[in-house]
Amino acid sequence: MRTQQEYLIRYKDGNLYCELADIWIDPSKPVKKALITHAHFDHFTFGCEEYISTKETAILLKERVGDNIKIKTFEYGEEFKINGINISFHPSGHILGSSQIRFIFAEEKWLISGD
């Protein structure tokens, strides 16, 4: 049986964290790099060094956080890599730009739904 430390994504300090990519998912505190499922206030926080989201979510984030944030955007289904992990956003239908986030690494597949 795996320990929590051995999972690709784990619960850490009240948030979801992918240590291999050094990335937090919908963090509740400022972090270096944050993947955002959608722009509701309970799914992002102010002060992250970099945000990663869909283009539509980025528009809403900038309205709420300010235009001076560093944000990378991706289309639904567009894969990008961080430290060998394939990551992509997929529609969730919750609000404009909301997404599920898929992680693929080696034989593991993870899907984070947000809400």
Name each model-derived stretch:
Residues T3-R10, N15-C18, W24-S28, K33, ...:
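His/Asp/Glu-rich metal-coordinating catalytic cores
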Residues H38:
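Conserved G/P- and acidic residue-centered "switch" motifs that form tight phosphate/ATP-binding loops
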